[in-house]
Amino acid sequence: MKVIEGVIPAPQAKIAIVVSRFNSFINDRLVEGALDTLKRQGQIADENITLVKVPGAVELPLAAKRLAKSKQFDGIVALGCVIRGGTAHFEYVSGECAKGLAQVALEAEIPVAFGVLTTENIEQAIERAGTKAGNKGVEAALSTLEMINVMNALGA
């Protein structure tokens, strides 16, 4: 039986990180985790990483699509944080963001990792940005690296 499974190191890969500025005190921690992972575990040099900042989570898919269409990147790490408030806005923002990023990955056929926190409150967001529940930026970077290698193994 042939098994195709990705590995983490991808030293030649070119990665874009697109991050929302809204809730930057959380997102900055996600970026730190992703960058550390890409450099240490992915063995990717600084010059092969591009960081793009957008206003909010709704803008992540459009920026990711433009990055993917440029054909300059092997994978995209999308990072952000949407915290539930007192209105239905949370559902619209988180749903459209997730759907848009998935669509970019499918259309461009490159990995687009969903590292957008969707939490009930600020405490949950803090926990997932490097404290009690790990750092989801790290997880998104690892997923991107592994999927780059899986896609390369699968061929054109």
Curated annotation (Swiss-Prot):
Reactions the enzyme catalyzes: (2S)-2-hydroxy-3-oxobutyl phosphate + 5-amino-6-(D-ribitylamino)uracil = 6,7-dimethyl-8-(1-D-ribityl)lumazine + phosphate + 2 H2O + H(+)
GO biological process: riboflavin biosynthetic process
Lineage: Bacteria, Pseudomonadati, Pseudomonadota, Gammaproteobacteria, Aeromonadales
Pathway(s) the chain acts in: Cofactor biosynthesis; riboflavin biosynthesis; riboflavin from 2-hydroxy-3-oxobutyl phosphate and 5-amino-6-(D-ribitylamino)uracil: step 1/2
Organism: Tolumonas auensis (strain DSM 9187 / NBRC 110442 / TA 4)
Active site: H89 (proton donor)
Top class in the EC scheme: transferase
UniProt xrefs under Pfam families: DMRL_synthase
Protein known as: 6,7-dimethyl-8-ribityllumazine synthase
